[in-house]
Amino acid sequence: MVLDLDLFRVDKGGDPALIRESQEKRFKDPGLVDQLVKADSEWRRCRFRADNLNKLKNLCSKTIGEKMKKKEPVGNDESIPEDVLNLDDLTADTLTNLKVSQIKKVRLLVDEAILKCDAERIKLEAERFESLREIGNLLHPSVPISDDEDADNKVERIWGDCTVRKKYSHVDLVVMVDGFEGEKGAVVAGSRGYFLKGVLVFLEQALIQFALRTLASRGYTPIYTPFFMRKEVMQEVAQLSQFDEELYKVIGKGSEKSDDNSYEEKYLIATSEQPIAALHRDEWLRPEDLPIKYAGLSTCFRQEVGSHGRDTRGIFRVHQFEKIEQFVYSSPHDNKSWEMFEEMIATAEEFYQSLGIPYHIVNIVSGSLNHAASKKLDLEAWFPGSGAFRELVSCSNCTDYQARRLRIRYGQTKKMMDKVEFVHMLNATMCATTRTICAILENYQTEKGILVPEKLKEFMPPGLQELIPFVKAAPIDQEPSKKQKKQHEGSKKKGAARDVALESQLQNMEVTDA
């Protein structure tokens, strides 16, 4: 995931100042741009010298061959003249005046210089890449510039009644329908572990079916992805911070051969976007085949480092969940990817409108975008039991930022003298099932249970197509209120104080008094 290097090169039509400005708007280090430009300039100088040295080496070999053909004297191990030691100034005429033995010595010096130059070039390439991979995509002009997501995300539009309030939150409702085992899940799987069971398993499967059929009717190809990826491929689709904060690493045998003791690192996927992005790795995509649209289905695994204390109860923020994803490969021309961007968020909106979930669309501020996204819109559903908007969908246009490192090129083959173009890649959540279940539970709660959304009824089993009944009491109703807790604690303290006073009084009393 990187920008085009030519964007940093003024002589190639690039504009480093534009990238520096984009970095500043992202509230990231603009100094990375200067570091990259410096390393790239030195790398290009080094490569130019290496090219000249290789030409000089070929010239040495050619001159030796001509002299041997003419049967000129080889020489008696004469030393190289001082003026010849400066390899950068050597010419064919200079070599012609040397003996064969001298030219061979010059060629050895050239070999040493090439090795030294190659080592320097590799070092500069590494320095340049370190900066390049931490520089974000160029921002779309419509992105709000701010580093405060809570205050400055721009609300683009609202659908449905986002003011209604209801009694219970999803944390209580998953228990009331007996569809969730949290404590036992944590014992088995650790923090945020859970068992989804009973009616909520059916509801989840109904959502998956409805989402896949909706996307299939719009030309998306359903695709069930691998759950883990090789490290070298994951590095091409995920930014560096994700390896520490989001991704789970697994280590397994590197081969199925019993005598092979090697081990290989792999990473569990955080979203089907990652394996689908790599699906056409190292390919040329024909213009007539675009757009290519996939409806990804996968289990997703996320560490959620940094979210300690947030949404610790229930199934809204968990380490493992199912998700249906929109993923599109688009033409880089004629604004096609931005037209597709609007189409994808519209598809997500239609899905949640058909489920009757109120929401608003927000334009995410520049400081909260990941490196790849040029722009991101989130669909945040209204949760009437929690009294808050919560994110269900993220829709991003990554332009050619991902495709470049994956080498997914636009066209059939490179044309002579033409620059290689890369496809644009876009992704958008369709349905993260656990979060959507939470939204349905809060919006469709009644006194007796959860009404089933009209569009999901055909996918639910008999007896659960109209209403999912409450079968357990709400945990919040079982817990004493804060006022009751305070009164209870106060009475305990008063009782303890009375006991201490009485004990003291008894110790000070005389026997006759007793």
UniProtKB/Swiss-Prot annotation:
GO molecular function annotation: ATP binding; enzyme binding; molecular adaptor activity; protein homodimerization activity; RNA polymerase II cis-regulatory region sequence-specific DNA binding; selenocysteine-tRNA ligase activity; serine-tRNA ligase activity; tRNA binding
Family according to the record: Belongs to the class-II aminoacyl-tRNA synthetase family. Type-1 seryl-tRNA synthetase subfamily.
Species this chain originates from: Bos taurus (Bovine)
Record field: compositional bias (Polar residues): 504-514
Binding locations of ATP: R302, Q303, E304, V318, H319, Q320, F321, E391, L392, V393, S394
Subunit structure: Homodimer. The tRNA molecule may bind across the dimer. Interacts with SIRT2. Interacts with METTL6; interaction is required for the tRNA N(3)-methylcytidine methyltransferase activity of METTL6.
Gene expressing this chain: SARS1
PROSITE patterns for the chain: AA_TRNA_LIGASE_II
Positions of post-translational Phosphoserine modification: S241
Positions annotated to bind L-serine: T271, R302, E325, N427
Protein name per UniProt: Serine--tRNA ligase, cytoplasmic
Taxonomic lineage of the native organism: Eukaryota, Metazoa, Chordata, Craniata, Vertebrata
Biological role stated in the UniProt entry: Catalyzes the attachment of serine to tRNA(Ser) in a two-step reaction: serine is first activated by ATP to form Ser-AMP and then transferred to the acceptor end of tRNA(Ser). Is probably also able to aminoacylate tRNA(Sec) with serine, to form the misacylated tRNA L-seryl-tRNA(Sec), which will be further converted into selenocysteinyl-tRNA(Sec). In the nucleus, binds to the VEGFA core promoter and prevents MYC binding and transcriptional activation by MYC. Recruits SIRT2 to the VEGFA promoter, promoting deacetylation of histone H4 at 'Lys-16' (H4K16).
Keywords carried by this UniProt record: Acetylation, Aminoacyl-tRNA synthetase, ATP-binding, Cytoplasm, DNA-binding, Ligase, Nucleotide-binding, Nucleus, Phosphoprotein, Protein biosynthesis
Major localization listed first in the record, in broad terms: cytoplasm
Pathway listed: Aminoacyl-tRNA biosynthesis; selenocysteinyl-tRNA(Sec) biosynthesis; L-seryl-tRNA(Sec) from L-serine and tRNA(Sec): step 1/1
Keyword ATP-binding among UniProt keywords: yes
